[in-house]
């Protein structure tokens, strides 16, 4: 079954070029599916005009929405004329990430694509507050698209958590690998690599416990990770030569390997916590993301529930 048949593209209101829309069309050409070009807009000055009646205010809002809709249609003109099914929707909402997630839920969208900004071609991608909210709270996978052509023969790198005792991490690892393999097969037979990072010995342990042998500890940790990686790759018949178990912090290991492999995309799982720790995707994931220079696909566990609710007035 083809994946991602109902894509939501978040339009960037500040530029004519729309890399996320381009990537969605690229996917559509290979796996089919519908595309919705979506833009939440809000202008505080329109809310401040107390001299206007509610009807006049609504008409002004509607005027802005119509202008923006026509502008997006112009950006998508080439694709629309080529027969790509793109629906355009502009909404008035003062919290873009909520508008996007509400649209994902209401429209049952199975993938969100959004452009990631960067200072220049060499630097890491910069994530806005809206990006972070989406990565943490969007129930569907979120694909952050870099404003660069896909590298020739660009690979997909799946970051897996091999250390966890928690059963949900195994399920999430398997989901990441399965979905990436499926996507790679359907899109352009992309080579898929797996990476797991394992920690180095904490120096303070070696100092506090003179009889402690760091090399034995390191070997044991590496051995555990290698066994976990072997079990995972064998489940999916993945060749050992495209799996990587590296010593170091994930936020260093994963971006470095992505660059070394010239990966087009890194795929990460996030547990997406709510409540007190809602500010974190999991520190590790956030730090990895901050160091990346390629596209990013963030996938949540099956049981993830977003804290964002539909507005009552949503139809």
From Swiss-Prot:
PANTHER family: UNIVERSAL STRESS PROTEIN E
Signal sequence, renumbered to the chain: none
Keywords: Cytoplasm
Function: Required for resistance to DNA-damaging agents.
GO cellular component: cytoplasm
Cellular localization per UniProt: Cytoplasm
Main subcellular location of this protein, as a coarse class: cytoplasm
InterPro entries: UspA (IPR006016)
Protein family (similarity comment): Belongs to the universal stress protein A family.
Lineage of producing organism: Bacteria, Pseudomonadati, Pseudomonadota, Gammaproteobacteria, Enterobacterales
SUPFAM superfamilies in the record: Adenine nucleotide alpha hydrolases-like
Organism domain of life: Bacteria
Name assigned to this protein: Universal stress protein E
């Amino acid at each position: 079954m083809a994946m991602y048949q109902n894509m939501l593209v978040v339009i960037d209101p500040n530029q004519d070029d729309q890399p996320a829309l381009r990537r969605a069309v690229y996917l559509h050409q290979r796996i089919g599916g519908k595309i919705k070009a979506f833009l939440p807009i809000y202008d505080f000055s329109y809310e401040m005009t107390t001299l206007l009646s509610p009807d006049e205010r609504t008409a002004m809002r509607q005027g802005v929405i119509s202008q923006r809709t026509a502008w997006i249609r112009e950006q998508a003109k080439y694709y629309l004329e080529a027969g790509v099914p793109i629906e355009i929707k502009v909404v008035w909402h003062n919290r873009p990430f909520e508008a996007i997630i509400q649209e994902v839920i209401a429209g049952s969208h199975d993938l969100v694509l959004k452009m990631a900004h960067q200072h220049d071609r060499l630097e890491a991608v910069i994530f806005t507050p809206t990006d972070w909210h989406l990565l943490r709270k969007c129930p569907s996978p979120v694909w952050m698209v870099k404003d660069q052509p896909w590298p020739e023969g660009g690979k997909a790198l799946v970051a897996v958590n091999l250390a966890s005792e928690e059963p949900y991490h195994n399920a999430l690892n398997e989901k990441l690998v399965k979905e990436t393999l499926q996507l790679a097969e359907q899109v352009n037979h992309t080579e898929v690599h797996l990476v797991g990072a394992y920690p180095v010995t904490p120096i303070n342990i070696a100092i506090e416990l003179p009889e402690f042998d760091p090399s034995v500890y390191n070997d044991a940790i590496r051995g555990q990770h290698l066994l976990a990686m072997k079990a995972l790759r064998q489940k999916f018949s993945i060749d050992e030569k495209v799996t990587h178990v590296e010593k170091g912090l994930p936020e260093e290991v994963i971006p470095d390997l992505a660059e070394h492999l010239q990966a087009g995309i890194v795929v990460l799982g996030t547990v997406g916590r709510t409540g007190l720790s809602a500010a974190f995707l999991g520190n590790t994931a956030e730090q990895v993301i901050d160091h990346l220079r390629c596209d990013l696909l963030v996938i949540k566990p099956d049981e993830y529930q977003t804290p964002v609710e539909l507005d009552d007035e949503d139809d």
